[in-house]
Amino acid sequence: MVGRNSAIAAGVCGALFIGYCIYFDRKRRSDPNFKNRLRERRKKQKLAKERAGLSKLPDLKDAEAVQKFFLEEIQLGEELLAQGDYEKGVDHLTNAIAVCGQPQQLLQVLQQTLPPPVFQMLLTKLPTISQRIVSAQSLAEDDVE
């Protein structure tokens, strides 16, 4: 008797679940803005991921890759600052400083060339970017081991 009641309850729950799936699918298919909203959501997620994530980090043991990354980040940072996009420009410059072999000298040069508010923004972001690079490097080393 108990087994029969359990089977009936499971069957009813399964039927309700399938009914809800059919209802949701029909509602989704009949909505003309569903695809547009889905595209917008994916676009926002992609932009958020680009903002939050670092540029693809080079292998820090490969001097040539680090130098190429450094030069690209400096160039991108300068271009973005020239366009007025200070936030992204500072992000790229902090990436360059984090992988730089002589960060103190680079900071002195940037202090002389950047406006004081932009340089302060750079100094504010530097610890977090450096920490991300160190953690990314340690994760890469863990993968090798």
UniProtKB/Swiss-Prot annotation:
Example GO molecular function: unfolded protein binding
Keywords in alphabetical order: Isopeptide bond, Membrane, Mitochondrion, Mitochondrion outer membrane, Phosphoprotein, Protein transport, Transmembrane, Transmembrane helix, Transport, Ubl conjugation
Protein topology in the membrane: Single-pass membrane protein
Positions on the Cytoplasmic side per record topology: 25-145
PTMs per UniProt: Ubiquitinated by PRKN during mitophagy, leading to its degradation and enhancement of mitophagy. Deubiquitinated by USP30.
Pfam families in the cross-refs: MAS20 (PF02064)
Membrane-spanning segments: 7-24
Cross-link (Glycyl lysine isopeptide (Lys-Gly) (interchain with G-Cter in ubiquitin)): K35, K56, K61, K68
Annotated positions of the Phosphoserine modification: S135, S138
Subcellular location: Mitochondrion outer membrane
Segments in the Mitochondrial intermembrane topological domain: 1-6
GO cellular component: cell periphery; migrasome; mitochondria-associated endoplasmic reticulum membrane contact site; mitochondrial envelope; mitochondrial outer membrane; mitochondrial outer membrane translocase complex; mitochondrion; sperm midpiece
Gene Ontology process terms (BP): intracellular protein transport; protein import into mitochondrial matrix; protein targeting to mitochondrion; response to 3,3',5-triiodo-L-thyronine; response to muscle activity; tRNA import into mitochondrion
Entry's family note: Belongs to the Tom20 family.
Family matches, as PANTHER family: MITOCHONDRIAL IMPORT RECEPTOR SUBUNIT TOM20, MITOCHONDRIAL IMPORT RECEPTOR SUBUNIT TOM20 HOMOLOG
NCBIfam families, sorted: 3a0801s04tom
Subunit note: Forms part of the preprotein translocase complex of the outer mitochondrial membrane (TOM complex) which consists of at least 7 different proteins (TOMM5, TOMM6, TOMM7, TOMM20, TOMM22, TOMM40 and TOMM70). Interacts with TOM22. Interacts with APEX1. Interacts with TBC1D21. Upon mitochondrial depolarization, interacts with PINK1; the interaction is required for PINK1-TOM-TIM23 supercomplex formation which is critical for PINK1 stabilization at the outer mitochondrial membrane, kinase activation and downstream mitophagy.
The protein's role, per its UniProt record: Central component of the receptor complex responsible for the recognition and translocation of cytosolically synthesized mitochondrial preproteins. Together with TOM22 functions as the transit peptide receptor at the surface of the mitochondrion outer membrane and facilitates the movement of preproteins into the TOM40 translocation pore. Required for the translocation across the mitochondrial outer membrane of cytochrome P450 monooxygenases.
Name used for this protein in its record: Mitochondrial import receptor subunit TOM20 homolog
